């Protein structure tokens, strides 16, 4: 039998169909400095140029032997399109992600424009997806969006948002309803562009910040609406502490759950059973950038597999300045150790 392409491997996994080995990919940023250097460009330039954005994704995926890729790379794109501006740090030599300089400071200021989808760098991302479909038909192409609560924290000051939960609860809930519709519209837009899967990153909603009770009333209903609207494979990603909300995360209706190193994945597997796709859950910076011993990298990845994940995902974006030998060890270990079946996905 012919080898599966990366795209075939990932898409079969989402359907829980038998595959030859565990896929090695992420629904979050996997661009690395080695790829950027090969392209003879800079990290600061790949956020505002469709060819460079797509090229960095494909070059990184092919350089390391990944089965998929995902764009964009920064969290400021939607806020910028809504008129909040962006700091791109164009002249920076190192790794600095774009940020939002002019967040709304009061609920009464908020005015989401109707044409944001065509503003700022949104068309750049659209063009990058078109390029990826032509240049990487053999790879699973992922888009990611921020969850409603996390997106809200990009377009207005988070501390004002949190304070408003007590003093202006109805107004905050109405605002989150607006932002939920934005998230849904973005997902439907990326679907229309032909992406293979979507990761919804409600990163700022772990129990480090919100109580499980607040998560159930403030986060879960809106995430459920988002996943109800997605008709292609979807991933519910939350970093930080998620042990106490993992069942509620599952109830939101995504095809897979993604968690970071703070989650007790072995216990999560027991709670949810073997039929749920679980991705995770290594510390990307600690494992790929600072870890000195290749054997330790291999052990971290093997532990993820042994704990019951169906795909070994980093807990967040891979920090671009990875050590080559660590990245190689990560990919190699997933492919070799992931030959055995995972709880939700059998092997051919």
What are these regions (language model features)?
Residues 47-48, 73, 239:
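Active-site nucleophile and cofactor-binding loops and adjacent substrate-binding regions
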Residues 44-54, 62-64:
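Short, structured active-site "lid" loops
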Residues 72-115, 138:
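A contiguous, low-structure linker/loop signature
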Residues 48-51, 102-109, 119, 292-293:
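Intrinsic-disorder/low-complexity, polar/charged segments
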Residues 38, 60-74:
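Active-site loop/lid in soluble adenylation, ligation, and acyl-transfer enzymes
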Residues 1-34, 39, 43, 56, ...:
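Active-site loop segments of alpha/beta catalytic cores
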């Amino acid at each position: 039998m012919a080898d599966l392409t990366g795209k075939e491997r990932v898409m079969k996994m989402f359907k829980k169909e038998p595959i030859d080995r565990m896929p090695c990919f992420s629904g979050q940023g996997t661009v690395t400095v080695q790829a950027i250097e090969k392209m003879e460009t800079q990290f600061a330039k790949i956020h505002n140029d469709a060819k460079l954005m797509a090229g960095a994704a494909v070059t990184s995926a092919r350089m390391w032997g990944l089965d998929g890729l995902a764009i964009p790379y920064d969290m400021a794109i939607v806020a910028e399109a809504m008129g909040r501006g962006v700091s791109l740090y164009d002249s920076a030599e190192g790794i600095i992600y774009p940020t939002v300089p002019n967040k709304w400071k009061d609920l009464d200021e908020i005015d989401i424009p109707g044409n944001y989808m065509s503003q700022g760098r949104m068309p750049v991302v659209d063009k990058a997806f078109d390029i990826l479909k032509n240049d990487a038909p053999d790879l699973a192409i992922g888009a990611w969006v921020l969850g409603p609560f996390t997106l809200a924290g990009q377009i207005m000051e988070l501390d004002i948002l949190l304070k408003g939960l007590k003093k202006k609860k109805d107004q905050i809930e109405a605002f989150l309803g607006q932002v939920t519709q934005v998230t849904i519209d973005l997902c439907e837009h990326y679907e229309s562009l032909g992406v293979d899967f979507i990761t919804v990153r409600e990163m700022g909603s772990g129990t480090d910040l919100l109580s499980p009770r607040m998560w159930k009333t403030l986060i879960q209903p809106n995430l459920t609406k988002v996943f109800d609207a997605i008709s292609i494979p979807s991933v519910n990603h939350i970093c930080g502490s998620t042990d106490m909300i993992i069942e509620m995360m599952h109830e939101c209706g995504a095809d897979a759950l993604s968690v970071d190193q703070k989650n007790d994945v072995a216990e999560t597997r027991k709670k949810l059973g073997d039929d749920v796709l679980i991705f995770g859950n290594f510390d990307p910076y600690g494992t790929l950038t600072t870890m000195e011993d290749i054997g330790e990298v291999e052990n971290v990845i093997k532990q993820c597999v042994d704990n019951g994940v169906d795909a070994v995902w980093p807990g967040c974006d891979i920090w671009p300045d990875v050590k080559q030998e660590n990245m190689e060890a990560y990919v190699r270990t997933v492919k070799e150790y992931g030959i055995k079946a995972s709880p939700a996905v059998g092997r051919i």
